[in-house]
Regions:
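Bacterial N-terminal signal peptides that target proteins for export
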Residues: 1-9
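C-terminal motif of bacterial Sec signal peptides marking the signal peptidase cleavage site
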Residues: 16-19
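Active-site-adjacent structural segments surrounding the nucleophilic cysteine of cysteine proteases
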Residues: 22-25, 139-147, 151-317
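Cys-His-centered catalytic/binding microenvironment captured across papain-like cysteine peptidases
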Residues: 25-58, 66, 70, 74-87, ...
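Soluble non-cytosolic domains of exported or imported proteins
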Residues: 53-57, 245-257, 318-325, 343
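Exposed beta-strand-loop-beta-strand "reactive/processing" segments of non-cytosolic proteins
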Residues: 77-131
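Active-site-adjacent substructure of cysteine-protease-like catalytic cores
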Residues: 98-121, 337-398
């Protein structure tokens, strides 16, 4: 693994330290000469602060550094400048309340929405601006407006999950804060501190123990960014649908697109209507445009229709649905396989990707008064930030999601293990993620 100077995730939580028997008193003789501030650990210094917020410049710097690490390195002749701008800031309460009262703001996490513009792509990053859990929560290089109900709900769920993982870290720090502060007093180093984190504090932490593990070194992400609209659905019937973007047809279906992208990665031999699927042609361009050749449209259209038929997809004008285990059925038709459905598990994803196997993920909403929200997509990469400092080990896990929306909203999302429960805009999720790991040829 490569050692990096890592602005991206400035801090995680140091182990709980032994406290003095009497928090009000020092554990050393008051006449003892004060030791250097360097004898305090980073987290002991943080425990003495009365304000944990990072400066906006530090927030922007973290996004810039993450972009350098997470994005492919273009040639110098084509490299564009990354323009960053803070669009909004939301204080999220440690209890998980989306918006805090004035009293609650005294101990809340500021979440920054940072707009990213580079070349012809316009995306965003979500960033925690609190030193207790300063990290990138989501990094999305390209995002269109959230114009469909499905996109809005699924992206909201992923954002909420990333924020939830962040809140847990801050909450844990609060449980050991007094112990850390008392240890600092025991070292007889009590001094006034700025209300804001100084840049030197961040730079010191950057020089300590960060290592990055990145799946791209051994497993490239998908080369295609397909979607559900035209021309992917061009072989479905026109039956009075009103969406012009879909050529007045039913959408191809998220489950169908996820399966199609998995097949494209492994290129199994497949004949549809007596004609072999030309994977090389299909993958020549990242996306297939509406202006593509008739031959290319036929290839992608018949592939999507074939998968839909094998998966027994139910086509409706507003959404096309497949069963949660449809991928198991379709893969079996082309000499491929995957694991049975399991709840989201980081180790399964990590091992699957390292073994050269994609992972299908899905989020399933429960019945509610609005409508059921389900989505399937492909996890095709990961990023791990490993932190080893003063006998304390911590990791932050990111998965790279290819969401099947023509590349829009694909990116790295900070996620934790299964068991997250929350409600967003009337849609309840009892279990955020399920996965089919180890997609591969038999």
């Amino acid at each position: 693994m490569k050692q990096v100077v890592y602005n991206v995730i400035a801090a995680m939580l140091l182990m709980s330290m032994a406290a003095c028997s009497n928090p009000e008193n020092l554990c050393v003789d008051p006449q003892t000469p004060s030791a250097s501030v360097d004898t305090l650990t980073y987290w002991e210094r943080v425990s003495l602060l009365d304000n944990y917020q990072l400066s906006e410049s530090a927030v922007l710097k973290s996004v810039e550094k993450f972009s350098e690490l997470a994005s492919p390195k273009p040639s110098r002749s084509t490299e564009g400048k990354l323009d960053l701008k803070i669009i909004s800031k939301l204080n999220v309460c440690l209890g998980g309340v989306s918006r805090c009262s004035e009293n609650q703001k005294r101990d809340s996490i500021p979440i920054y929405y940072v707009q990213m513009d580079k070349d012809d792509k316009h995306g965003y990053a979500l960033v925690s601006g609190d030193i207790r859990t300063a990290r990138i929560l989501a990094f999305v290089p390209n995002a269109t407006s959230e114009k469909t109900y499905e996109q809005y709900q699924i992206i909201s769920l992923l954002k909420e999950a990333s924020i939830h993982a962040c809140l847990k870290q801050a909450y844990f720090f609060n449980t050991i804060k007094d112990s850390l502060a008392n240890t600092a007093k025991c070292k007889n180093i009590i001094q006034s501190r700025s209300s804001y984190i100084e840049r030197d504090d961040i730079l010191e932490m950057e020089d300590q123990g960060w290592q990055l593990e990145w799946s791209k070194k051994k497993f490239p992400e998908l080369s295609v960014e397909w979607g559900q609209g035209y021309p992917y659905n061009c072989k479905l019937e026109q039956k009075g649908c009103t969406n012009a973007d879909y050529d007045y047809r039913c959408p191809a279906g998220c489950g169908v697109v996820a399966i199609a992208q998995a097949l494209a990665y492994y290129e199994p031999k497949l004949s549809i209507n007596g004609q072999l699927v030309d994977w090389r042609m299909l993958k020549k361009q990242t996306c297939i445009e509406s202006t593509a050749s008739r031959q290319l449209k036929n290839q992608i259209g018949f592939l999507m229709k074939w998968i839909g038929n094998k998966a027994e997809a139910k086509h409706e004008c507003d959404a096309t649905s497949t069963s949660i285990n449809a991928i198991e059925v379709v893969l079996g038709q082309v000499g491929m396989q995957c694991d049975k459905l399991t709840p989201f598990n980081w180790n399964s994803i990590y091992n699957s990707i390292n073994n050269g196997s994609l992972v299908e993920a899905n989020a399933v909403g429960l019945e509610n008064e609005v409508e059921e929200v389900c989505h399937s997509w492909i996890i095709d990469g990961y990023m791990i930030a490993n932190f080893n400092f003063e006998s304390y080990n911590e990791q932050a896990f990111y998965v790279h999601n290819n969401l099947g929306w023509n590349g829009s909203y694909d990116g790295y999302y900070l996620l934790e293990d299964a068991g997250i429960k929350f409600e967003v805009s009337g849609v309840k999720l009892d279990r955020l993620l399920n996965i089919h790991a180890n997609i591969k040829k038999k």
